[in-house]
Every structure is written in structure tokens, then in C-alpha cells.
Amino acid sequence: MRTATLYRYSVPMEAGVILRHQRLKSRDGLLVKLQQGELSGWGEIAPLPEFSQETLDQAQVAAECWLQHWVSGVESDDSVLPSVAFGLSCAQAELKQTLPLSADYRKAPLCTGDPDELFAVLQALPGEKVAKVKVGLYEAVRDGMIVNVLLEALPDLTLRLDANRSWSRAKADGFAKYVNPALRSRIAFLEEPCKTRAESREFAQDTGIAIAWDESVREADFQVEAEPGVAAIVIKPTLVGSLARCQQLVQQAHQAGLVAVISSSIESSLGLTQLARLAAWLTPVTVPGLDTLDLMQAQVVRPWPDSPLPLITTEQLGVVWHR
């Protein structure tokens, strides 16, 4: 016999979490639990405002429709809504015990704020020093100076940078001008520096700073292929779709000689632990981009190892659908 439950969560965010144009005060999403006999599987459906094509309400309607079929014994195709496809595929994989349990809890720390504080955090990193710095929120020249200072001060540091398509070509060049050419090879990649793919490609070839595709991966005309100056693709499953789709993208990236990075869309601790398992399975040699839990004030259902944040249990969540 099959049963399914859909829970809704809302977790307060730390002050100052800004997406593209708005402050994110709470992270809201759905957790799905599939039960079949003694086995169960969980998944998270949490569209990210400003980044997902679907709203949470739209995702809930689609999830309820899929679950209604599933409980009745009908196997439906993956939802066309990426967050729904991802969450439901995780729940099914757990139920069928096909999502490996081993997880990669390494995370490239997400660095924001004062360079002196960053320096202390980065210096204390154990093992491979890989960190992520958001650029494009302030002046491009300032970003270039900070990146240069960090790379100069920490010779074993590699940086991943993310500009979210925020720069014109001129601003991107302004950033590059302040990064010593001798240090640029330690920028693993800069995600989508410019507003268009063509400008980003030209920037990479002109500056020697490698780029990665992020937003582009979710666009209909995107193809994974080897290109001069392109080092990686960033895969955000909540925005991309099912586990099968993520697996396909990783395989295509590796065949093209590109790095594939599994990355968070600010999921709850439950979703993050599943992303850590996905990363250990599909991209075992690459540090995933999962350092977003500290943006929240609580964990949900499953804890992240060693996190001091309080845990919201199933009993504390609202049930929005059950059959």
C-alpha cells in the first residue's frame, strides 16, 4: 500500500540575505514523504524566488497532482517544474534505495563581508582551500581588489567567483584589471560574468580568467560542450530538475572535459544533505557548493553534521496534503 504526505515549512533567514533584487526574509518550501510498506523516501520541493520559473503555490499544485497518481499506483512522468521533479525524484530514489547514503559534506565556504574576516575564515580551512566569493554586488573594481588581496595573502587558496550576469563587458574588464595576471589561474572559474554568453566568452579569452555556466545551464538553447575559456558548469538541482537530468548534465560535462559542480539553491538541511549525497555519487572529486545552511535560523527534519542550528521536526510542520 502506498501513502504520501506533503509538509510545508517556513524557516526565518538571517538578516541581510539578498537575492537578485529582494531581501529573503524566510525560506519556504515543501517536503514530500513517500511510504510503501516498510520503506519510505523524502524529498524537498523549494522553488527559489527570482531564480525558479515556478512559484511555491504552483509547485504545490503540481506535486499534489503527481502524488494523487502515485498513491493510486499510476507512475507519472517527471514534472515539468524543476523543483517538483527534483524533490519527487529524490523521494523515489530514497524509497527504491538508489540514492547512495555516503555524502560529501565538504563545502566551499561562501564568503561575504569584510576582507579581514574572510582572511581569518579562509586561513582556518582544513585541506583543500576552495572558497566562493559573490561578486557584482558592489563596484567591480572593489571586487577585483578584494579577490587580488585574498589570492595574494593565501598562496594555497583557489577561488570560485559568481557574478550572476551582473556586469557589462566594461565592468568585467574593470574587475580583471585589478587581479594580477599571475594570480588569475587560481580563480577556478567566474560564473557568468557578463549579461550575455557571447560577452562572457570574450571576457574569458581576453583575460585568461576561466568562466563557468550557471544560469545558461537552465536555458532551452544551452548545450554542454568544450569551449575555450570555459572550465565548468554549475548544476543547481532545484532549478534544473530530476536526478536523472542532473546525472545527464554531469555526464555531458565530464565527457566535454568540464568540471561539474553540484550547488545549492538555499534548500533546507534536508535538501542540502541530499545534495551532499548526490555530489558524493556524481562528482566525488569536486567540492560541492553547499555552504548556505548558515543563512537560515533553523534546520528541518534532517540535520547537517555538526550544525548548531535548532532542528524543526516533522511534528512541528504543517501537513498540506495526505493520502
Curated annotation (Swiss-Prot):
The keyword Magnesium applies. This is o-succinylbenzoate synthase. The gene is menC. One of its GO terms (biological process) is menaquinone biosynthetic process. Its cofactor is a divalent metal cation. It comes from the Bacteria. Pathway: Quinol/quinone metabolism; 1,4-dihydroxy-2-naphthoate biosynthesis; 1,4-dihydroxy-2-naphthoate from chorismate: step 4/7; Quinol/quinone metabolism; menaquinone biosynthesis. One of its GO terms (molecular function) is hydro-lyase activity. The active site is at residues 134, 236.
